[in-house]
Amino acid sequence: HNMPEGLAVGVGFGGGDLGNAVALAIGIGIQNAPEGLAVAFSLLTIGYSRKNAFLIAGATGLFEPVMGFIGVSIVTVFLPILPIALGFAAGAMLFVISHEIIPETHRRGHENWATGGFTIGLLIMLSLDILLG
């Protein structure tokens, strides 16, 4: 799901509204830290060395800047498709959440933690939207 996140940030910056683009980039960046730690810890538990777990977790995030560059490039050249591109990026992220992340949290019995994390994340994003305009 790093690809649609990168695409969303790239499209946001390509659209010219710097305030919203920065808020989106900060929001996605904030959630990338615990996500990367989760990947690294998962790799450690199955026997990877700390170095390899760190490198692999970092490598999973490399798709974001690549897709960000693609998003900026497409929207810069074809500005009229900005709403469509933002809709596609948002839809891709919602699909990943609804079809992968939510079922996984409920399958393992962490419904309350997952709901709390979702609520806190939503409040942070709303706060950033209000503060950064």
Task: Label every model-predicted segment.
Residues 3-133:
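Intrinsically disordered, metal-sensing/regulatory segments
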